[in-house]
Amino acid sequence: MARLYYDTDANLEPLADKTVAIIGYGSQGHAHALNLRDSGVQVIVGLYPGSPSWPKAEQDGLMVKTVADAAAAADWVMILLPDEVQKAVFQGEIRPHLQPGNVLLFAHGFNIHFGQIQPPANVDVIMVAPKGPGHLVRRTYQAGEGVPCLFAVYQDASGMARERAMAYAKAIGGTRAGILETTFREETETDLFGEQVVLCGGLTALIKAGFETLVEAGYQPELAYFECLHEVKLIVDLIVEGGLEKMRHSISNTAEYGDYTRGPRIITEQTRAEMKRILAEIQSGQFAREFVLENQAGKPGLTAMRRREAEHPIEQVGRELRAMFSWLKK
């Protein structure tokens, strides 16, 4: 089993008298910036001129500068931007201002692991990745708790990179819950695999296939939506709270029996073989190259797929049914 590290295993000393630039002020950016500030760290937010997040960050009491100015003023730079824009921003606005001994941080290893960003040899390169959305990272911190984090070291120029990563994780509240050491490679490859095979790609394909099967068999689309999409949250909440065991303890015997006897007929040996092929594409860099080329071309494929998926019948049915859900309007 992996070892978890807690508050007593880390200290904030590496952050003493240091300025941290948080590049981006989205879901993770606002949580990191505010938690760091509340932990006594000097924080600057780096944004592009005219960013709608600029006044919001200022209203939150933070100093805001352009990305280049923030990078120039900081000792530590955390890049919390979409994967596809990080390379250009790093090359044009961050790299020219990095000084020996600085710390370059990421919350996902994609651009480092796949060579899109090649940092200078005289800076530490580390990762701190909360395993939860930004609003949860912030809310739990304010409640005196935290969200578990992964941390990793890619480049240790100072000899203190590991301690620095743990200090940052502590400052955003991670060590209150526990932090797990990993590598950029492991985090990147497992994250992409989980997204593609289970959480996003696998789940949405399963939901749509179930919906389509019922509708094609003559059942009302509304019932198909309830059974194949709406109730997913009910099951997932049980799994998150107590694992598969709690979910199976909470459902009916009929549902549990169907789980054991029919589930394996959906995830077959052929499905598992395809999972392995997808993992191999991630490990080889094939997916990363494909994604980079897609973005360089202006995202024509992604745009077309978004448009096509938005027109799926399940979306129209869902919009109509969700209008009935009063709890979603609160």
Curated annotation (Swiss-Prot):
Protein name, as recorded? Ketol-acid reductoisomerase (NADP(+))
Domain KARI C-terminal knotted, residue spans: 183-328
| Reported cofactor(s) | Mg(2+)
Record-listed Mg(2+) 2 binding positions: D191, E227, E231
Entry's EC annotation = 1.1.1.86
The UniProt GO MF terms for this protein read: ketol-acid reductoisomerase activity; magnesium ion binding; NADP binding
Coding gene?
ilvC
Its biological function? Involved in the biosynthesis of branched-chain amino acids (BCAA). Catalyzes an alkyl-migration followed by a ketol-acid reduction of (S)-2-acetolactate (S2AL) to yield (R)-2,3-dihydroxy-isovalerate. In the isomerase reaction, S2AL is rearranged via a Mg-dependent methyl migration to produce 3-hydroxy-3-methyl-2-ketobutyrate (HMKB). In the reductase reaction, this 2-ketoacid undergoes a metal-dependent reduction by NADPH to yield (R)-2,3-dihydroxy-isovalerate.
InterPro entries in the record, alphabetically? Answer: 6-PGluconate_DH-like_C_sf, KARI, KARI_C, KARI_N, KARI_prok, NAD(P)-bd_dom_sf
Ranges for domain KARI N-terminal Rossmann come to 2-182
Principal EC category: oxidoreductase
Q: Binding residues for NADP(+), per the UniProt record?
A: Y25, G26, S27, Q28, S51, S53, D83, E84, V85, Q86, G134
Q: Which UniProt keywords apply?
A: Amino-acid biosynthesis, Branched-chain amino acid biosynthesis, Magnesium, Metal-binding, NADP, Oxidoreductase
One BP annotation, GO: L-valine biosynthetic process
Instruction: Please list the residues that make up the active site.
Output: H108
Cofactor note, please? Binds 2 magnesium ions per subunit.
Which family does the record assign? Belongs to the ketol-acid reductoisomerase family.
Q: Which Pfam families match?
A: KARI_C, KARI_N
What's the source species for this entry? Synechococcus sp. (strain JA-2-3B'a(2-13)) (Cyanobacteria bacterium Yellowstone B-Prime)
State whether keyword Transcription applies. Answer: no
Return the GO cellular component terms, semicolon-separated.
cytosol
